[in-house]
């Protein structure tokens, strides 16, 4: 289940590696599917507000993504880590083409990125260049995947998983792992906001990484 997969993100697990071609009709143990991918037409309302949003589609998807990611972590955090899950403090949107934005005590002019700010427990993203580029290249769920990765960094801090001096590559791969566990939850049909097929939908997300 989810707990076992999450454990694999943080520890070495026993087992035998199996080729992805072992069963051509399954992907990671899930049936190969070509159904819809993206925001559900009857998606639940977002639980988070986005600061400095322009009210556009990209910020809508980002806000829904964080709401959904937090729904997931709320349901599994205490099963896997000490303490209770606490949502990030705020969500911040900016336009990297503008000169007057700030994130994590720094200017957002030219900041084509999405990130978790440890200093104030916020997650932010560039709606001017980054999010539109992600959507155009790999679909709406590319935004969700990138933000799931950033939320993985929030989980690392919350659960105190990495000691000072942990190699950046290790922390980034662990955040990727956390994002992958969330996306599997979506692919299994558990998300009240998004769907993800294991054909082109999943392939597009892997291309985003």
Q: Where in this protein do the model-derived segments appear?
A:
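Active-site metal-coordination segments of metallo-dependent hydrolases
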Residues: 56-59, 161-176
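Catalytic zinc-binding patch centered on the HExxH motif and its immediate surroundings
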Residues: 16-17, 95-124
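An active-site-proximal "capping" alpha-helix that borders the catalytic cofactor pocket
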Residues: 74, 169-185
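C-terminal motif of bacterial Sec signal peptides marking the signal peptidase cleavage site
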Residues: 5-8
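A metal-dependent hydrolase signature that marks the N-terminal structural subdomain at the beginning
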Residues: 10-103
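Long, well-structured alpha-helical subdomains associated
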Residues: 186-209
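Catalytic Zn2+-binding segment of zinc metalloproteases
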Residues: 151-167, 181-187
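Short pre-active-site segment immediately N-terminal to the catalytic Zn-binding motif
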Residues: 128-145, 163-169
